[in-house]
């Protein structure tokens, strides 16, 4: 393990660009920005302040897609910092907490909405004491860039969070409150089935813990950051836990695979505010763009 960079305020949404630079979001209310970090981790620059940006994705045109959670929306952003609101709603319903985001194999944008507003769930930057009593209607949204249509692929999740497409090109979404990872029957959603669960039965903390951002490697393993549990849990292609990579802090929020050939993951962690790099047996599954 090595520290790639530090002094980040609640980092999330890492994306490694083709030149090896790293995009991250900083959720802390004092920053609320998207930051670009040099490939060696030594320098960084502010791209844009959007409020409380959460997840990021980059499409084939180089457009940065942002799940913005403070003023709930899906944004389009350039490296010059110019942003455009793409969506405030899905199927006419206002977004509550756009959390994570990815590009699908069909070129559409897929977004998890955690199903509760940031202001209702958080006390400052951290979950409020009675978070478990809140009503949650986590949703999965799809935005068709060609026709401009939006629709819900699923709803009723207990804090929809991480989202990814697997080597089978179907959709996977996790649910923070239960620890569950779900697999859908097709790229367009459809029937939901339990793929696996990342909660460690030997972990005795009563604080919030559950899956956050996740990515697949090229050999079909799924790497899931587990907020509050302090690890990246690795599942095999059948959904079985095969490894737990302990992180330096207890609040990892997301990860990205390093450049091709590096066999590394970049893990962003909130408690200590840094990016940690770990070796892996394979490169990441190439992301759809």
Give the residues covered by each predicted segment.
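A short helix->beta-strand "capping" segment at the edge of beta-propeller domains
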Residues: 1-8, 288-289
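Beta-rich, blade/repeat-based domains predominating
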Residues: 6-21, 49-68, 73, 90-109, ...
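Short loop/turn segments immediately following the C-termini of beta-strands
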Residues: 27-29, 69, 114-116, 176, ...
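A short loop-to-beta-strand structural motif that recurs across blades of beta-propeller domains
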Residues: 33-35, 73-75, 138-141, 180-182, ...
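Short loop/turn segments that connect beta-strands within beta-propeller blades
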Residues: 37-42, 78-82, 144-148, 185-189, ...
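Beta-propeller fold detector
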Residues: 44-48, 84-88, 151-155, 191-199, ...
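Short, conserved, GDST-rich strand-edge loop motifs in beta-rich repeat architectures
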Residues: 112-135
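Loop/turn-rich, solvent-exposed surfaces of beta-rich toroidal or solenoidal domains
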Residues: 175, 179-180, 192, 196-240
